[in-house]
């Protein structure tokens, strides 16, 4: 469950390390976002000499949350951290690698490129 002012780790090699959520996209006044939702965030920590700089405003898709995800099969899954992958306006990832596992719900929300780059899909 991601809301305004939530900090997230970045799960790709775009150059950003930490994000601060500014807004959850979708709906007029949407409060919470989960796996597969797009957020607007600002970069709080970044690697030097990379395209993404500190204080940049970026779009990202949530790939892991500490809040458990309940699936239709009755199974629930929970991750150790809140993480996101930076995307461009077309919805494609800005980095070329994705680190750590991602949830299967991303495939249902048409982020297949991120799913194919991920080392593990849970």
Curated annotation (Swiss-Prot):
The keyword Isomerase does not apply. Keywords: Ribonucleoprotein, Ribosomal protein, RNA-binding, rRNA-binding. GO terms for cellular component: cytosolic large ribosomal subunit. CDD domains: Ribosomal_uL14. One of its GO terms (biological process) is translation. Disulfide bonds: none annotated. GO terms for molecular function: large ribosomal subunit rRNA binding; structural constituent of ribosome. Binds to 23S rRNA. Forms part of two intersubunit bridges in the 70S ribosome. Part of the 50S ribosomal subunit. Forms a cluster with proteins L3 and L19. In the 70S ribosome, L14 and L19 interact and together make contacts with the 16S rRNA in bridges B5 and B8. Belongs to the universal ribosomal protein uL14 family. This is Large ribosomal subunit protein uL14. It comes from Acaryochloris marina (strain MBIC 11017).
